[in-house]
Swiss-Prot record:
It catalyses: notoamide E + NADPH + O2 + H(+) = notoamide C + NADP(+) + H2O; notoamide E + NADPH + O2 + H(+) = notoamide D + NADP(+) + H2O. It is found in: Membrane. GO terms for cellular component: membrane. GO terms for biological process: alkaloid metabolic process. This is Notoamide E oxidase notB. The active site is at 199, 229. It is a single-pass membrane protein.
Length: 454
């Protein structure tokens, strides 16, 4: 699809080199936005307060709706992003009860868009950062952004006593975004859902001398495993990555030890205490108890209601990713929707042209807000299913599953959708009309099962 085919609305597209995009936050949303904007020919300045691209976390899944975007990079090859060291090579997601009985084994294929690849989060971010650097994108780490500003013709930030100017600012600074309130004027109150999450990933050498933990390495060097154990109000996922080089585990439940919503270092003792009452607990504890110091993190899960808007009053600043729509982890879509945001951002800037940056950002909001808000709400619904293990229920919808299968989420092509819907959304912005999203189910409901889009 060429520019001449898609840019049928408004003035001709200006030279891409005339547009400078400032991106604050270089996590998954920020790095993919930087790459997508660079691919359109724009000048990108990426700012990150941390000294490098490393982030806390264990495993992240990217399904077909985001992988199709990454697959367009590097001449259509994913080889630069996918290797054995950063992926989980699993052939099945195995589900167990607290007795240790296997209840379900769901075949897993990374090439299935409803499933996708499982990555070590830090490994994926390192790959994204390396690729962006190879492209020559200006990435600046260790930079503290102190303020945001915009005029009718430009926007920028104050960082490390420097005023940085561009045509627009994209804030991808995460769940605890400082930019959110400045850009949107909103400070939504997080809802405590009564769940604490623990997570860890560490070198498998830590369990090498533990006979009771060797079950987790049964496929090491040839494949990985992924086991999820469900009990009332608590679930534990445990497995390997990089064909047995790493052990990862996560626990979410109504545990006694409560923390702030910030992810922070912790010891796994509350998890081990919980497992004492599980018949299978000793098997799991054999590995979890060997978590090295500094490798376990916890946080209280909090649900944030959807924002009313993502774009600043002047139209030259926007929030994306977790800064715009933080998800609970149960929907498995946080990283995926951040990547969709990034791709749609690049397309809207391309189609609107340099003189129309405010229009471009407002169209991004029109195209993305309804979709991610519904998934955001749905992540709470998904959490209820994960933590209410009704193995004996006659209603299959009440039994635990490893993932949901909504085609409108996993099979969505946000690139094709953005090109097709840009003009309708742009006209809605210009004329002050409501825009009806076409990338959500017709009845506007999330559902654990599938729903058809308009």
């Amino acid at each position: 699809m060429t520019k001449s085919q898609v840019n049928t609305w408004g003035p001709a597209i200006s030279s891409p080199a005339e547009l400078t995009v400032i991106i604050v936050g270089l996590g998954i949303a920020g790095l993919t936005a930087a790459i997508e904007c660079h691919r359109k020919g724009y000048t990108v300045i990426g700012l990150e307060k941390k000294p490098d691209a490393n982030q806390l976390g264990d495993i992240i899944g990217l399904s077909g709706n985001s992988m199709r975007i990454l697959a367009e990079w590097n001449n259509g090859s994913l080889a630069h992003l996918i290797d054995d060291d950063i992926t989980c090579d699993v052939t099945a997601l195995e589900l167990f009860d607290a007795e240790g009985h296997q209840r379900l084994a769901m075949p897993y294929n990374a090439n299935d868009p409803n499933q996708g690849y499982l990555f070590r989060r830090t490994g994926l971010l390192t790959k994204l950062c390396h690729y962006a650097s190879q492209l020559g994108i200006d990435l600046r780490f260790g930079v503290n952004v102190d303020g945001y500003w915009e005029t009718d013709s430009s926007a920028g930030v104050y960082a490390n006593n420097e005023k940085i100017t561009g045509d627009c600012v994209v804030a991808a600074d995460g769940f605890h975004s400082k930019a959110r309130a400045i850009i949107t004027g909103e400070t939504p109150a997080p809802e405590d859902i009564g769940v604490v999450a623990y997570r860890s990933i560490f070198d498998a050498d830590a369990i090498a001398d533990v006979p009771e933990a060797q079950w987790i390495l049964k496929k090491a060097q040839t494949a990985d495993i992924w086991h999820t154990y469900y009990a009332k109000d608590t679930m534990v996922a445990i497995g390997t990555a990089a064909r047995g080089r790493y052990v990862h585990w996560g626990c979410a439940g109504a545990l006694e030890d409560r923390s702030e919503s910030w992810m922070q270092p912790a010891a796994p003792y509350p998890v081990l205490k919980c497992l004492e009452s599980w018949p299978v607990g000793g098997q799991l504890a054999a590995a979890i108890a060997r978590t090295p110091p500094g490798k376990c993190f916890q946080q209280a899960l909090r649900a944030i209601p959807p924002l009313k808007r993502w774009v600043s009053t002047g139209g030259r600043m926007i929030v994306i990713g977790d800064a715009a729509h933080s998800f609970l982890p149960y929907a498995g879509q946080g990283g995926n929707q951040a990547i969709e945001d990034a791709a749609v951002l690049g397309i809207c800037l391309e189609l609107a042209g340099t003189p129309n940056v405010p229009l471009a950002l407002r169209v991004v909001e029109k195209l993305r807000h309804g979709r991610v808000s519904l998934i955001q709400k749905g992540s709470v619904e998904a959490g209820d299913c994960f933590l209410d293990a009704a193995w004996e229920s006659d209603d299959t919808a009440e039994r635990p599953t490893a993932f949901t299968h909504q085609a409108w989420v996993y099979a969505h092509n946000c690139v094709e959708h953005a090109y097709k819907q840009f003009h309708a959304a742009a006209e809605a912005v210009i004329n002050g009309r409501e825009y009806t999203p076409t990338n959500v189910p017709t009845d506007g409901k999330f559902r654990q099962q599938d729903g058809k889009c308009m």
